[in-house]
């Protein structure tokens, strides 16, 4: 399973359960099944996401469809046109579908007392994640022309709901809490989702591919509309915008273009950091108001925070905003 993620959603759920003071065997058994369903759904999303993006690697290993298709050649599509379909792509599509079925089976294992509420939320999460993936594809097709509202909505749907809101609410339901926590958690999760999506954008551009497992050239070459690009472009002088327009969306961008873009990100980091602090601050305030302790919030953020080793030193200076 670690090929498909760090299990951070399950770890977030565990911290929330601990913070709610619930840890009986029935609650933990229910949470285990709920988290299994969530992790299987996450694996399905990654397999399909790599297929959609035509990604060759994930975490420095071949993506599922690339690994499966290696050395198998191609097979003919079952139609009159004689098109060729890569066997790996077929396997990736079907494997993702199979993982979705397995995730539903895991949810079915939740005891009846908690199953209805969790299953209802799980369906909502799945639909939002799928819609968020579509929004992400549209943003990439539109290149850098999209506005910040569209970018934020994509981050909430694609990232926040199943990475933050789902594990927190699963724990709340398993602990016997009702829908009274849904509002605060959705608000906090939406802010966290935007914040960590922005951090992911920074990491992809500024990071060492050997550490991040991602190419820093992908977004640069595609001209993808990201929150990071929007913020940097908003802060650029006329001369800097000329540089930005030359390198962002350049299909054959290389190290020279990447260096220019990285320099612009570094120069305008204070504006990016201000947005991060606003988003994280709003999330923390909402969780505190719902009764979550500072320690629980700190633990949640530590699990959600993406790897920053090998990233520009500025990232280590992000103010965590905690007292003491």
Kindly give the residue locations of the regions a language model identified.
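All-alpha prenyltransferase/terpene-synthase fold signal
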Residues: 1-324
